[in-house]
């Protein structure tokens, strides 16, 4: 196990013990304009922080779909959403991440890993 104190501090700040979901967002440039992806990222980041939600977030450059983005994936359910605008992101945060109910009309795929 790594004993570097800076790495240990980084993990402590992430508070992995409290996380209930991990949200990944592809911000382009192949599936969408980078500006569109980053606008959605800004909303996701702000809402999770404002609401103090027990969720991790990760910004990604490519999910290898390369069309129909920005793409957002919510784990542990492994629900894939395509075309996630800032407005759609708001609803996904409210209904899926907070309420536990995936937004059915925007689901492109589900693929639980376990």
Go through the PLM ranges and name each one.
Residues 1-25, 29-31, 49-52, 78, ...:
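Iron-sulfur (Fe-S) cluster-binding modules
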Residues 20-35, 58-77:
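Local cysteine-cluster metal-coordination motifs and their immediate loop/turn environment
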Residues 37-38, 86:
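Conserved strand-to-helix beginnings and helix N-cap segments that scaffold or border functional pockets
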Residues 41-55:
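Conserved helix-turn-beta segment immediately C-terminal to the redox Cys motif
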């Amino acid at each position: 196990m790594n004993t570097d104190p800076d790495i240990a501090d980084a993990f402590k700040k992430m508070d992995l013990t409290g996380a209930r979901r991990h949200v990944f967002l592809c911000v382009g440039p192949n599936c969408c304009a980078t500006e569109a992806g980053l606008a959605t990222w800004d909303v996701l980041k702000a809402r999770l922080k404002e609401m103090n939600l027990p969720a991790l977030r990760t910004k990604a450059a490519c999910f290898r779909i390369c069309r129909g983005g920005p793409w957002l994936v919510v784990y542990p359910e492994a629900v894939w959403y395509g075309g996630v605008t800032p407005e759609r992101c708001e609803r996904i945060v409210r209904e899926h991440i907070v309420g536990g109910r995936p937004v059915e009309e925007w689901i492109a795929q589900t693929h639980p890993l376990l």
